[in-house]
Amino acid sequence: MQKEVLNVETPEGLRIIERIPVTAGSVILIGFMLRVWAGLHTVIVNPDGALYIQQAMAIHDKNWISLKTCALTFISAYPFLIAVGYRLVHDWMLSARMISLICGTAMLIPLYLIVKEWVRKDNAILTILVFAVTPVLVSNSVEVIRDPIGWFFLSAGIWAVIHRNTPCRHGFLLAASLCFLAAAWARIESILFMAITLAYLLYDRKNTKTMDILFFLSPLLVIFFFSLAGMMFSGLTLGDLHRGKEIAGKFIEPIRQYRLMADSLKTLVWSSPNPFVEFFLPEVRNHIWLIAMGTVLNRFLEAFFYPFVVFYFLGLSGIRKYRSDTRLLYLTALTLSGLSMLYVHTLQTWMLYYRFFGIVMIPAVVCCAFGMEKLRDIISRKWSSEPVIVFWVLFIVIIGISLPKNLKSGDTDKSVFIQIADTISRHAPDAAAIKTATSRHTQIWISFYANLHRAGTPPCPLDEANCWEFYPDDPALFRNRLRQNGLQFVLWEEKHWLFHNFSLSDLMGSADYRELGRWHHRDTGQMILFAVNGPNN
């Protein structure tokens, strides 16, 4: 008897995998290997990362009180993921870097699926190669920061929105909403994508039904109830989780800071001994907005990587060609709103890191794809080259021009701070948490690494009570402050030691201190570690 052949539909998840050809998978593997290399050659944790790991330790120990007592006023998704990863690998640093690595690499998959909606597979492959090797994305995909988590969920959310015109439209919109909320939990700025997407759905009424909008908004209610449950079990407030006050402050604070900056510059005009400053500062005061714009432009070019910027600019014409496609209008709105937000952020804080431009790069991926397509057409026509030859030439060039920057090892000299922390840990009692008096410049690294492998939630690695800048300039009073705060060690730093009545000779000549070792770093000068002698230490 002939067997009946069943026509089983391939699940959507498997269809997504089938859409990724071998070459695209190889590009993702290249991106992964570059990130692994960067991770293996990243010597020391970034300062923010120490605070996230400290929060993760508190979560692991169910020490909810310590979650917001150490510099950070919010609780993002990252510490929870680190705590989960620690249960698998039993190493805090490995867990934190592993999460960034996975998310920073996985974002390439939805980006490929996005650009494949408009360009051929070969051009889509070259586009994600650009994202796989962009130095800012590579280096920050192994740092202990929240951005890679946000990048992945933003990419996945955008893909779900532009792919919503399928029989599973409600499922895609629900997934998009969850992705944007997850991204916002990692980086609060990502809530902008939620707002722009809602505006887009309301605008594109031709392809959007009322139920679509309801499905998109439904996770907000679920998140609200989960937040209430979290409050009941952990004692946290709703504001600890959604950071609503910070979102509202983004609209008001830049205006206030702009006025404060203008007033400060006005005061400086008469306080400088240089007569030319009297004419220079009023010009600066009147053009603060222009300086902020120049700052954003500079960081934009650096973050996107100068050689790769040409792809994005060439792709602008491609957007005009498909202007009837409302999905491109959506991506353009995301890109421009991201740039606008970074400009406002600059006016507010004047701190603009390269990694912040991830929220601009992601929606601009289609612009890069159009630019890649146009560049290949130009090269093929001008030199009458075969498309496959142009493909592999560009493939090699893209990797080649980015490789020197991606293989460069940074901050290797900072391993000296880990050596100091290891020395402290060896000379401290096994059961006790370690507290060391240092300058504010080194406190977070020394405290973090000295307590990293000790049981329980460690002390805050950014506690001003352990920074000797706030101590009295008197040997006896200094020693009393150490005893009051329970500090077991003192790190003298040549360039940061501010005391006049309390010098290195007082430390070395006192029976209260015992020298343990000497080190040197260009930022601190010579460093000498002392153990604090006494009945309480």
Locate predicted features:
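Short acidic/glycine- and proline-prone juxtamembrane loop motifs at membrane-interface regions
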Residues: 46, 71, 136, 142-149
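Signature aromatic-anchored transmembrane alpha helix within multi-pass, membrane-resident enzymes
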Residues: 25-28, 178, 195-198, 217-224, ...
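Short helix- or helix-capping micro-motifs
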Residues: 28-34, 127-135, 139, 159, ...
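Perimembrane helix-loop-helix junctions
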Residues: 3-7, 160, 167, 192-224, ...
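Membrane-embedded, lumen/periplasm-facing catalytic core of multi-pass transferases
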Residues: 395-449, 453-462, 475, 528, ...
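Hydrophobic, aromatic-rich transmembrane alpha-helices
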Residues: 109, 201, 281-327, 334-335
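Hydrophobic/aromatic-rich transmembrane helices and adjacent perimembrane loops
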Residues: 53, 140-141, 147, 186-188, ...
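Luminal/periplasmic acceptor-recognition loop/helix of membrane-associated glycosyltransferases
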Residues: 436-439, 450-505, 514-533
